[in-house]
């Protein structure tokens, strides 16, 4: 898959229309947001779509969407930013049921949203059906505002 960065930097036309198409990806800024606000990531290539979302409410925020693919078994990747200035808590729910929870407390080398703080949580083996609501709850800590980039839905072969 041609990269978004290379396409933009080279200015070579994308004759086959492949750049920027990530069918399995749902951008955080495109989800139904409750409390989260969109932020630009600089440089833009350090986040999918050049944007992310942050939560400024101490009680937490949610980002949700409806599953619209074929029913089956899936892995979910949650791409988020883990900064050195806090330990946000994340919870993932499928149709109201808690399926995963973690604290973003890796020791990454930066205090800014970007490539050095971008990390991923994989949740494996979830049975999903069309219409299921997938909801990510982020609870900020310190100066880390439970930042999210995107979610990927990966069908499993059994």
PLM region descriptions:
Residues 1-158:
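Extracytoplasmic
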């Amino acid at each position: 898959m041609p990269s978004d960065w290379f396409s933009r930097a080279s200015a070579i036309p994308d004759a086959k229309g492949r750049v920027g198409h990530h069918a399995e990806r749902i951008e955080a800024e495109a989800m139904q947001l409750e409390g989260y606000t969109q932020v630009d990531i600089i440089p833009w290539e350090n986040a999918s779509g050049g944007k992310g979302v942050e939560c400024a409410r101490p009680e937490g925020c949610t980002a949700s969407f409806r599953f619209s693919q074929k029913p089956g078994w899936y892995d979910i990747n949650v791409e988020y930013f883990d900064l050195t200035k806090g330990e946000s808590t994340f919870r993932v729910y499928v149709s109201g049921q808690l399926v995963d929870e973690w604290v973003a407390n890796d020791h990454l080398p930066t205090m800014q949203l970007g490539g050095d703080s971008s990390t991923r949580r994989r949740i494996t083996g979830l049975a999903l059906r069309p219409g299921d609501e997938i909801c990510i709850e982020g609870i900020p800590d310190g100066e880390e505002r439970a930042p999210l980039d995107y979610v990927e839905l990966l069908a499993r072969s059994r």
